[in-house]
């Protein structure tokens, strides 16, 4: 029986010019055990990378219904500042049943980007302690975006039938990076959602770029991007 099945991976790399050291971090999705596992380099010499012991960096117990959260991705700069993130839902959110309870209901019941930050090449990670050590994009940010969206959309061009918008959906095509100052940058897709379908709205739905100064992040949800 296969006990480990490391599958989709993402690599973060940084070079410490002062110490002349290469730093490599890699995170994998595990299909056998679920969750995402992080490895950081203990040494990089002569083209060989010696990775340390795995760390469960994204615990599936902290996420909602299986299959609705992405695998983790990594980004690192040469200052040792990095980001590890997913686009997902918090535990308590049952997408199949259409219910949302604690802890998700105390955070967000929407699918949202969530991430952790490092300043030491992935040796340790920090986030919002109240959200399983993830910073996340709160509902208020999306509410600001949706203020310019229409309240209803045409769902049948032949009959002119309309439906009210009841929310949004984000597909699995997304990206997260840190810049040279270690500030997080997030690109996600947003589609309009009605009771019966997911729709595009010209000039409204599509890909959105979100960012925040890392120094503005705190341990409570009001300080998230």
Which functions belong to the PLM regions below?
Residues 1-225:
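Extracellular, repeat-based ectodomains that mediate carbohydrate processing or recognition
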């Amino acid at each position: 029986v296969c006990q480990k099945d490391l599958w989709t991976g993402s690599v973060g790399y940084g070079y410490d010019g002062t110490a002349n050291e290469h730093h490599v971090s890699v995170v994998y999705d595990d299909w056998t055990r679920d969750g995402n596992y992080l490895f950081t380099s203990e040494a990089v010499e002569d083209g060989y990378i010696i990775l340390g012991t795995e760390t469960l960096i994204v615990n599936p117990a902290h996420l909602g219904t299986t299959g609705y959260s992405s695998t983790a991705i990594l980004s690192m700069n040469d200052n040792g500042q990095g980001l590890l993130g997913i686009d997902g839902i918090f535990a308590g959110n049952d997408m199949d049943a259409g219910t949302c309870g604690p802890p998700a209901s105390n955070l967000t019941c929407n699918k949202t980007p969530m991430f952790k930050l490092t300043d030491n090449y992935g040796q340790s990670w920090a986030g919002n302690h109240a959200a399983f050590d993830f910073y996340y994009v709160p509902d208020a940010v999306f509410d600001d975006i949706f203020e310019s969206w229409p309240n209803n959309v045409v769902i049948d061009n032949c009959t002119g039938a309309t439906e009210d918008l009841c929310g949004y959906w984000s597909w699995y095509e997304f990206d997260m990076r840190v810049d040279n100052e270690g500030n997080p940058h997030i690109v996600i897709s947003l589609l309009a959602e009605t009771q019966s379908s997911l729709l595009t709205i010209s000039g409204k739905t599509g890909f959105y770029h979100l960012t925040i100064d890392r120094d503005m992040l705190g341990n409570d949800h009001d300080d998230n991007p």
